[in-house]
């Protein structure tokens, strides 16, 4: 089980990323635009730098819903490999079963 402080920190980062997503996208669009002047791009760049660091989506870490494990998480199920195995063995995941050949 991951530390609860790490799990809460990651939840906070996800909320911030969602909150500032529109503003961040608008500023990035100005930066990538060929029509914008040099001054507009500099202004957009400074505004982008002043946004909270944790509002960047790349700082959000996918974690297991049950254990909080940061690595070995399957996106499709939202579970870590260990918890996915347990859920599969219990028959909690429809259509998923242990491979046998």
From Swiss-Prot:
GO terms for cellular component: cytoplasm; small ribosomal subunit. InterPro entries: Ribosomal_uS14, Ribosomal_uS14_bac/plastid. Pfam families: Ribosomal_S14. Transmembrane segments: none annotated. Keywords: Ribonucleoprotein, Ribosomal protein, RNA-binding, rRNA-binding. NCBIfam families: PRK08881.1 (NF006477). HAMAP family: Ribosomal_uS14_1. Binds 16S rRNA, required for the assembly of 30S particles and may also be responsible for determining the conformation of the 16S rRNA at the A site. This is Small ribosomal subunit protein uS14. It comes from Xanthomonas oryzae pv. oryzae (strain KACC10331 / KXO85).
